[in-house]
């Protein structure tokens, strides 16, 4: 039974960050309270009806490998699945799924309701409760105190949220939901650095008024991909297509004529928006020579009448939005059933956070999601999981955990945020990861599931399946190394005839698989192949490990060199003013950031190689003193 006032961890906000945080904490055995304005909006897809994409899907796979629920939720609600960059190397291939918004929310709700140690309540938090520079609970609008050892703030766009449509604006966390004004005001009174960002969404269109004839159709890939390592294609609901249309010169002219009604271009809206998901107004202004822009028509669900026109996010007045939509092929007679809008909200400087996402200033207070300056469901969910597990560890007075840049995209994300900070909404891309060949989608479980098991995040069924996969991979890779093909065998003739491969000496199946034109299924047609495995996931892993073995080895060696700096810790340095030779600018930055290692210090803007050398010399001298 719960003591209804005392918990180990309290999570404020039940979007993608909040729900993953609450799940992680409760799975680790902590009594967890999840507070939300509306239980009916648990894990809601507030903007686009999709999960995954370039770089983002890697985060989803990592969440899954650590026992999180996003991959499972999209497997049970995805109505179109595709592999992006399928013609490129495995490092940048990314899964993307269209979601049925209602099914997604219902799946998240079902998972949360089955979770032990978790209580979900409807309440708006207006204040935090502090004791000796530590957070010890929250105060709700109806004056109820809830106490805990750790608090995770995952308030999304609700802190100081303001919606803009044309030159009109009003306070809201998202359309139809009120802003958390009191909590925003209270947090601004603390010594936390806060600023404003904005994001936007397109109008929603009645599917019954769209003319899909003559539009490019986009179906699911075959075979249909699966997100979760525990998933199966049978989990997917019915698959339906999306459609592609384009803006045109008429569309662009309508927008140009109405820029004086845009809150972005009239100065009403100050916050910076996402660089890689600009409004249609931004596209027209920034790319004046473009004759058209893509618009993907994405159904919001199997039973929904809403279509999400991906590519025309806008905050222009509703009457202008109607003109824009009517100018686009297939949408000439379409009816808008919800206007597009921009929303401006508070975010807190992530440089004020440790790599565990705990505040450097307030013990026990963790931040996750859009309030850290990120954009996207996947970025939010991955931060939520990390904040939740560390809030749980903190409540047990146990040292926190975070992945390194060479271990996970989540490691890249939190290192970028806490080391570099951000002035615009941060979106994950594969290009942000310097070790992306080692951080592929297919090996997320091999990188993280054992860690998740030690942390208490991975249940028995996932652990058993993971170990079976590892055994299958190891057994098959050893078999392929031992299985040889003779140059005088019938298989040699097949290789010459079908693949123009001439054998001059005996070759192993493993060596053969290294060749670019050979796939695992090609080996299965050879007489000497004998019995292989049928696990497609393991087969993909085997192919990638064998084909890219040389590149992976070189990257592993690079990681080893990199780890020397990551494992050279700076915790012994309390005041950088005392180190001779550092410039005043470097001293200020090091004292402000408080990097945990030489590696992290080297990634801070303005920290020069000369400064790193001085730090290394200082550490060597200090180490020598301690040996005397």
From Swiss-Prot:
Subunit structure: Homodimer. Heterotetramer of two MnmE and two MnmG subunits.
GO molecular function per UniProt: flavin adenine dinucleotide binding
Residues annotated for FAD binding in this entry: 13-18
Compartment(s) where it occurs, according to its Swiss-Prot or TrEMBL record: Cytoplasm
Family the entry assigns: Belongs to the MnmG family.
Superkingdom of the organism of origin: Bacteria
Protein name in UniProt: tRNA uridine 5-carboxymethylaminomethyl modification enzyme MnmG
Lineage: Bacteria, Pseudomonadati, Pseudomonadota, Gammaproteobacteria, Enterobacterales
Function (record text): NAD-binding protein involved in the addition of a carboxymethylaminomethyl (cmnm) group at the wobble position (U34) of certain tRNAs, forming tRNA-cmnm(5)s(2)U34.
Keywords of the record: Cytoplasm, FAD, Flavoprotein, NAD, tRNA processing
Chain sites annotated for binding NAD(+): 273-287
GO BP terms, alphabetized: tRNA methylation; tRNA wobble uridine modification
Cofactor: FAD
Family annotation (InterPro entries): FAD/NAD-bd_sf (IPR036188), GIDA_C_N (IPR049312), MnmG (IPR004416), MnmG-rel (IPR002218), MnmG-rel_CS (IPR020595), MnmG_C (IPR026904), MnmG_C_subdom (IPR047001), MnmG_C_subdom_sf (IPR044920)
Keyword Transferase set for record: no
Record bears the keyword Transit peptide: no
GO cellular component, as recorded: cytosol
SMART domains the UniProt entry points to: GIDA_assoc_3 (SM01228)
């Amino acid at each position: 039974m719960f003591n209804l006032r005392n918990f180990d961890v309290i999570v404020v906000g039940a979007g993608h960050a909040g729900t993953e945080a609450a799940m992680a904490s409760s799975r680790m055995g902590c009594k967890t309270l999840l507070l939300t304005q509306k239980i009916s909006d648990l894990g809601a897809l507030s903007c686009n009806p999709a999960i995954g994409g370039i770089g983002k899907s890697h985060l989803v796979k990592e969440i899954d490998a650590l026992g999180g629920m996003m991959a499972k939720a999209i497997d049970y609600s995805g109505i179109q699945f595709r592999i992006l960059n399928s013609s490129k190397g495995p490092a940048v291939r990314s899964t993307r799924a269209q979601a049925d918004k209602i099914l997604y929310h219902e799946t998240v709700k079902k998972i949360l309701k089955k979770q032990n140690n978790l209580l979900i309540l409807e309440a708006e938090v207006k204040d935090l409760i502090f004791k000796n520079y530590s957070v010890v609970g929250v105060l709700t609008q109806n004056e109820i105190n809830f106490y805990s050892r750790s608090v995770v703030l995952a308030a999304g766009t609700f802190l100081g949220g303001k919606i803009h449509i044309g030159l009109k604006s009003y306070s809201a966390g998202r359309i139809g939901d009120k802003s958390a004004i009191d909590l925003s005001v209270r947090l601004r009174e603390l010594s936390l650095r806060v600023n404003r960002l904005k994001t936007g969404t397109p109008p929603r269109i009645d599917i019954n008024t769209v003319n899909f004839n003559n539009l490019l159709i986009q179906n699911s890939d075959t075979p249909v991909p699966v997100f979760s390592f525990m998933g199966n294609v049978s989990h997917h609901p019915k698959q339906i297509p999306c459609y592609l249309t384009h803006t045109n010169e008429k569309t662009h002219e309508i927008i140009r004529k109405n820029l004086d009604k845009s809150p972005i271009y009239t100065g009403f809206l100050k916050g910076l928006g996402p660089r890689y998901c600009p409004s249609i107004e931004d596209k027209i202004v920034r790319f004046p020579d473009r004759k058209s822009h893509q618009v993907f028509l994405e159904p919001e669900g199997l039973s929904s009448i809403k279509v999400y026109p991906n590519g025309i996010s806008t905050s222009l007045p509703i009457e202008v939005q109607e003109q824009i939509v009517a100018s686009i092929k297939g949408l000439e007679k379409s009816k808008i059933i919800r206007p597009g809008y921009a929303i401006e909200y508070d975010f807190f400087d992530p440089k004020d956070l440790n790599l565990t996402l705990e505040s450097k200033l307030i013990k026990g207070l963790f931040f996750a999601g859009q309030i850290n300056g990120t954009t996207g469901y996947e970025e939010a969910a991955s931060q939520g999981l990390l904040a939740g597990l560390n809030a749980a560890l903190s409540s047990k007075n146990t040292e926190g955990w975070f992945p390194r840049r060479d271990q996970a995209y989540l490691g890249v994300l939190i290192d970028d945020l806490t080391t570099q900070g951000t002035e615009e909404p941060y979106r994950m891309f594969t290009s942000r990861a310097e070790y992306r060949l080692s951080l592929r989608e297919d090996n997320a479980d091999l990188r993280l599931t054992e860690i998740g098991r030690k942390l208490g995040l991975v249940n028995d069924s996932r652990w058993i399946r993971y170990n079976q996969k590892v055994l299958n991979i190891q057994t098959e890779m050893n078999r392929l190394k031992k299985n040889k093909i003779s140059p005088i065998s019938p298989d040699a003739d097949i290789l010459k005839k079908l693949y123009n491969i001439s054998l001059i000496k005996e070759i192993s199946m493993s060596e053969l698989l290294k060749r670019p034109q050979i796939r695992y299924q090609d080996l299965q047609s050879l007489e000497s192949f004998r019995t292989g495995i049928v696990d497609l996931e393991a087969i993909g892993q085997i192919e990638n490990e064998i084909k890219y073995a040389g590149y992976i080895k070189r990257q592993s060696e690079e990681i080893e060199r990199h780890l020397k700096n990551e494992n050279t810790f700076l915790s012994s340095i309390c005041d950088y003013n005392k180190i001779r030779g550092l410039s005043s600018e470097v001293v200020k930055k090091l004292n402000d950031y408080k990097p945990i290692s030489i590696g992290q210090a080297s990634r801070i803007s303005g920290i020069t190689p000369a400064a790193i050398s001085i730090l290394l010399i200082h550490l060597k001298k200090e180490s020598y003193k301690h040996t005397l």
